[in-house]
From Swiss-Prot:
Tissue-by-tissue expression: Highly expressed in dendritic cells and primary leukemia cells, especially those of myeloid lineage. ACC-6 expression is limited to cells of the hematopoietic lineage.
Protein name as annotated: Minor histocompatibility protein HMSD variant form
Free-text function comment from the UniProt entry: This splice variant of HMSD is the precursor of the histocompatibility antigen ACC-6. More generally, minor histocompatibility antigens (mHags) refer to immunogenic peptide which, when complexed with MHC, can generate an immune response after recognition by specific T-cells. The peptides are derived from polymorphic intracellular proteins, which are cleaved by normal pathways of antigen processing.
Subunit and interaction comment: ACC-6 forms a complex with MHC HLA-B*4403.
Record GO biological process: activation of immune response; cytolysis; positive regulation of type II interferon production
Top-level taxon: Eukaryota
Amino acid sequence: MEIFIEVFSHFLLQLTELTLNMCLELPTGSLEKSLMISSQVLQIPVANSTKQR
């Protein structure tokens, strides 16, 4: 479980950096869209991991 948390937090960090880098190049209106997309992407692996247990 701890390994999963480390991997997940590392993935979250990379995703946040990627989102911020994208937002610097895009207009501010797309910031909300990219945040919505990233939150949807994060919900999928969490749901899958709970089903596997």
